[in-house]
Amino acid sequence: MKHSTPSICLYFQVHQPYRLRDLRYSDIGQPDMQYFDEEKNRNIFQKVAEKCYLPTNALMQELVERYPHFSIAYSLSGVFLEQCEEYGPEVLESFQKLARTGKVEFLAETYYHSLSSLKSIEEFAQQVTAHVRRIHELFGQQPRIFRNTELIYSNELAHIARLMGFHGILAEGADHLLKNLNPNDPFVPPAFTLPLSVRNKIRKERPYPKAARSIDVLLKNYRLSDDVAFRFSDKKWIGYPLHADTFTDWLMQSGGRSVNLFMDYETFGEHQWADTGIFNFLRALPELWQERGIRAVTPSHAIREARGWKKQTYDAHTHVSWADTERDLSAWQENLIQKSALDELFKLEGAVRTANDPELMRRWRMLQTSDHFYYMCTKYWSDGDVHKYFSPYDSPYEAFRRFSHALCDLRQRIPQS
């Protein structure tokens, strides 16, 4: 049955990286050398927990329990979950409490929030499998919807996810791919046959024993998502101040089957501070939606509801992502220092695997986190301020220096054959 009023699919990305400490050249090769700034990582996590995670989870708990047609979805990176255990067990407990409501879906991603999908199918599959297992251990769910790091997506990746056993995948609704199509409509990737070598690697490492017969693509409605995530407190924006009833009007007028609002969870309380009214805005939405017959559904529910709909093809021959105005890989792989850093890291894969040393493997994987490369971005113009806001370093070159010293130390730790 087709509904004239679209559903809302709310998905939140929850991630905190391990930021590199001020590594000196003289530190390289020291037996007890630690790559990450323990104090800074702890302080940032606890600050964001107080401003965002704990108050937002408490509000979400209230909303999902009060409103029968209000459900949400999260993707929690493996490194975020580790920081919960190290720095804030109460944050993890609040997510587990949400899971017990039965109205929250947890998605799969790469464990280390890594760029492994760009470099190594084997590593990518192993990280996804590790993440699926961790989500099951902590929340009792086996994720069947996949979202790649930074919403990086391509036709090939969609079919890799299908072969891993996933029924759905999230992607950015990029204008240059959509052309005149509505991102709220259901989509599928084009028919695509992966090389046999790739298929064999996936079968060896995948989280589920069987491939899915098909995979649906849920596209982020970036305009409506960014109205909340980026523009909510912008006094120069024509839509300021944004009220819940106005936003609901925009949602209802946007058409299609499911309005997919995907954003960082830190939108609430961290990027948009409490004094902007962001929590009051969030609190008001479910009641308005209930009055107007709008349901907030999980990604799995949205895909099930679209079974009777004709699905458009979302054809992404090259990678798209949810970063910056370009919505491509340039936030992590635009300049020479970014490309060199990632290339040199993955040149070590064979030697790291041969060493069969869990600590060495963990260090290598921790350096794959996308944030390390994001901090090396030298973009300016429209996106420069965003990159500066998120970076803990004074410059992209400082990010590269710290990463290079960690990489040099890692290289020295590999046994010489």
Identify the residue ranges that each predicted region occupies.
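Active-site and substrate-binding clefts of carbohydrate-active enzymes
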Residues: 2-51, 65, 187-192, 197-199, ...
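A short acidic (Asp/Glu
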Residues: 20-23, 83-88, 118-120, 149, ...
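An acidic- and aromatic-residue-enriched active-site/binding cleft used to recognize and process polar
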Residues: 13-17, 77-79, 111-114, 140, ...
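Generic structural signal for well-ordered alpha-helices
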Residues: 57-61, 92-96, 125-135, 158, ...
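Acidic, His- and aromatic-enriched active-site or binding-groove loops in soluble protein domains
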Residues: 91-108, 129, 141, 162-209, ...
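Short, well-structured secondary-structure segments
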Residues: 5-12, 18-120, 144-147, 167-172, ...
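Metal-dependent polysaccharide deacetylase catalytic core of the NodB/CE4 family, i.e.
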Residues: 76-150, 213-233, 256, 260, ...
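Catalytic domains of cell-wall/extracellular-matrix polysaccharide-remodeling enzymes
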Residues: 129-188, 267-285
